[in-house]
């Protein structure tokens, strides 16, 4: 079977990751002790994508949990699904990274990284045919961003032909934990551009907006935000975990979604987003799902897709529904909003349908868009970065760990290049290239 090894790094990564395991354990009928209590053969058919089956019929997540301080790990271990994970797969330091990317990437994190790689290697040896890795982390802190990107590059060295997929929580302007977030995020993006195959950009600000506006929560907690993220992660990985009509694995997804290797930053979305109490008052239809899912307010990244154009889109519909209706709706959306899809990639919307809906819903859909509007997110971080870097504010924390200012300059220019690449493809039209060819031909004739 095509296995995936899951890694969660840092506080945010561990909280989102653990929530993800709770959700998919529930979907596959795995109880907190790892026993199977489900009622459908479909739940077990592809269970070994994410779980190892132990000799005593216990299903164990194929996961490595990493942090530079013990706190988060303790709360995972004492949480509802704490007994699910293999005890040896908790790897933590004692010092913490103090929201410092350099500590996570060069000093503290580098000391712990070999222990993590040992666990990852062990998990990979249990695999029949490993398809790739997924990492959950945030880019604003120290461990998830610094050590997370270090792990990615080390794993890349050792498994160069496997897919590397990350769920990265981007720092947002309104919800800020630390002053140096723009530094940490820029240094991380610099790594992600080079070393990952697909990155789902999740943004706290967008999640807060969804909680306020759509779910009508007056005081959203991190628990509510993580609930949204886990619903999205569960949706994105559906076609890997359940037999569906379009069985995507990570590589097929990458082939469909990434037209240029550097432009692999996706905007996820989820529908239906209804507040907890109001679900019973409405029946969902495929047209409603499709409508909601392309709505800017349902995006988990704080970018407006109407400000850019979609290079590619993948959608996953879950629940009993007719394929024909789904295809008709998707075509309708594309023809109505054709200006928002680049015309030089025909058939750039892919649809997968899975018969098993998420817990508590009759039908649901997940959206993955590769849109040029994601540049707004990078622009925002880049502006904050430049404002501080111009004054060299807080830089001594990083140089003190052995970093060079040159690295900051490189990361900054790499991010700006990324923004202009997105802009270039946003402006490109189908006949741009032809004009260039005509010019060349004239020169040859001359």
Curated annotation (Swiss-Prot):
Residue positions, PTM Phosphoserine: 172
Gene3D superfamilies according to UniProt: Helix hairpin bin (1.10.287.600), Tubulin/FtsZ, C-terminal domain (3.30.1330.20), Tubulin/FtsZ, GTPase domain (3.40.50.1440)
Tissue specificity statement from the Swiss-Prot or TrEMBL entry: Ubiquitous. Maximal expression in breast and lung, where it represents around 10% of all beta-tubulins. Largely decreased expression in most cancerous tissues.
Gene Ontology biological-process annotations: microtubule cytoskeleton organization; mitotic cell cycle
Annotated positions binding Mg(2+): 69
Protein modification: Some glutamate residues at the C-terminus are polyglutamylated, resulting in polyglutamate chains on the gamma-carboxyl group. Polyglutamylation plays a key role in microtubule severing by spastin (SPAST). SPAST preferentially recognizes and acts on microtubules decorated with short polyglutamate tails: severing activity by SPAST increases as the number of glutamates per tubulin rises from one to eight, but decreases beyond this glutamylation threshold. Glutamylation is also involved in cilia motility.
GO molecular function, one term: structural constituent of cytoskeleton
Short motif MREI motif, span: 1-4
Membrane-traversing stretches: none
Gene: TUBB6
PROSITE patterns according to UniProt: TUBULIN, TUBULIN_B_AUTOREG
One GO location term (cellular component): extracellular exosome
5-glutamyl polyglutamate, modified sites: 438
Family according to the record: Belongs to the tubulin family.
Domain comment in the entry: The highly acidic C-terminal region may bind cations such as calcium. The MREI motif is common among all beta-tubulin isoforms and may be critical for tubulin autoregulation.
Subcellular localization: Cytoplasm, Cytoskeleton
The species this protein was found in: Homo sapiens
Main location: cytoplasm
Disease (UniProt): Facial palsy, congenital, with ptosis and velopharyngeal dysfunction: An autosomal dominant congenital disorder characterized by non-progressive bilateral facial palsy, velopharyngeal dysfunction presenting with varying degrees of hypomimia, rhinophonia and impaired gag reflex, and bilateral ptosis.
Binding site for GTP: 11, 69, 138, 142-144, 204, 226
Alphabetical keyword list: Cytoplasm, Cytoskeleton, Disease variant, GTP-binding, Isopeptide bond, Magnesium, Metal-binding, Microtubule, Nucleotide-binding, Phosphoprotein
SMART domains assigned to the protein according to its UniProt record, in alphabetical order: Tubulin, Tubulin_C
CDD domains xrefs: beta_tubulin
Subunit structure: Dimer of alpha and beta chains. A typical microtubule is a hollow water-filled tube with an outer diameter of 25 nm and an inner diameter of 15 nM. Alpha-beta heterodimers associate head-to-tail to form protofilaments running lengthwise along the microtubule wall with the beta-tubulin subunit facing the microtubule plus end conferring a structural polarity. Microtubules usually have 13 protofilaments but different protofilament numbers can be found in some organisms and specialized cells.
Cofactor(s) annotated in UniProt: Mg(2+)
Protein name per Swiss-Prot or TrEMBL: Tubulin beta-6 chain
Annotated function: Tubulin is the major constituent of microtubules, a cylinder consisting of laterally associated linear protofilaments composed of alpha- and beta-tubulin heterodimers. Microtubules grow by the addition of GTP-tubulin dimers to the microtubule end, where a stabilizing cap forms. Below the cap, tubulin dimers are in GDP-bound state, owing to GTPase activity of alpha-tubulin.
Family matches, as InterPro entries: Beta-tubulin_BS, Beta_tubulin, Tub_FtsZ_C, Tubulin, Tubulin/FtsZ-like_C, Tubulin/FtsZ_2-layer-sand-dom, Tubulin/FtsZ_GTPase_sf, Tubulin_C
């Amino acid at each position: 079977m095509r296995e995936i090894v899951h890694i969660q790094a840092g506080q945010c990564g561990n909280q989102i990751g653990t929530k993800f395991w709770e959700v998919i354990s529930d979907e596959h009928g795995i109880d907190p002790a790892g026993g199977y209590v489900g009622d459908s053969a479909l739940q077990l058919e592809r269970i070994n994508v994410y779980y190892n089956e132990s000799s005593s019929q216990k299903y164990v997540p194929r996961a490595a949990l990493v942090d530079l301080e013990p706190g988060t790990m303790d709360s995972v271990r004492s949480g509802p699904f704490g007994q699910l994970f293999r005890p040896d797969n908790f790897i933590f330091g004692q010092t913490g990274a103090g929201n410092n990317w350099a500590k996570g990437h060069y000093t503290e994190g580098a000391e712990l990284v070999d222990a993590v790689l040992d666990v990852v290697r062990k998990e990979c040896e249990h695999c029949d045919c490993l398809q790739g890795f997924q990492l959950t982390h945030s880019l604003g802190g120290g461990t998830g961003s610094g050590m997370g990107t270090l792990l990615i590059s080390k794993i890349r060295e050792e498994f160069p032909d496997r897919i590397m997929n990350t769920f990265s929580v981007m720092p947002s302007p309104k919800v800020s934990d630390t002053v140096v977030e723009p530094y940490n995020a820029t240094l991380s993006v610099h790594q992600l551009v080079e070393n990952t195959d697909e990155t789902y950009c999740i943004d706290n600000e967008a999640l807060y907006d969804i909680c306020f506006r759509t779910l009508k929560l007056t005081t959203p907690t991190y628990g509510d935000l993580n609930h949204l993220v886990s619903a999205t992660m569960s949706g994105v990985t559906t076609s890997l975990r359940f037999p569906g009509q379009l069985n995507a694995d990570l590589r097929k997804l990458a082939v469909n979604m990434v037209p240029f290797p550097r432009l692999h930053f996706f905007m996820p979305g989820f529908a239906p987003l209804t507040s907890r109490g109001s679900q019973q008052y409405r029946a969902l239809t495929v047209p409603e799902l499709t409508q909601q899912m392309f709505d800017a307010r349902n995006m988990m990244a704080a970018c407006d897709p109407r400000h850019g154009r979609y290079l590619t889109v993948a959608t996953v519909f879950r629940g009993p529904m007719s394929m024909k209706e789904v295809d008709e709706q998707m075509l309708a959306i594309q023809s109505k909003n054709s200006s928002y899809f680049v015309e030089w990639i025909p058939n750039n919307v892919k649809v997968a349908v899975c018969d098993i809906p998420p817990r508590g819903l009759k039908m649901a859909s997940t959206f993955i868009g590769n849109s040029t509007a994601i540049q707004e997110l990078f622009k925002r971080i880049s502006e904050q970065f430049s404002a501080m870097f111009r004054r060299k504010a807080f830089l001594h924390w990083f140089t003190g760990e052995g970093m060079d200012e040159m690295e900051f300059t490189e990361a900054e220019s790499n991010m700006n290049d990324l923004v202009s690449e997105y802009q270039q493809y946003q402006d490109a039209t189908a006949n741009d290239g032809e004009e260039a060819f005509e010019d060349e031909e004239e020169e040859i004739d001359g």
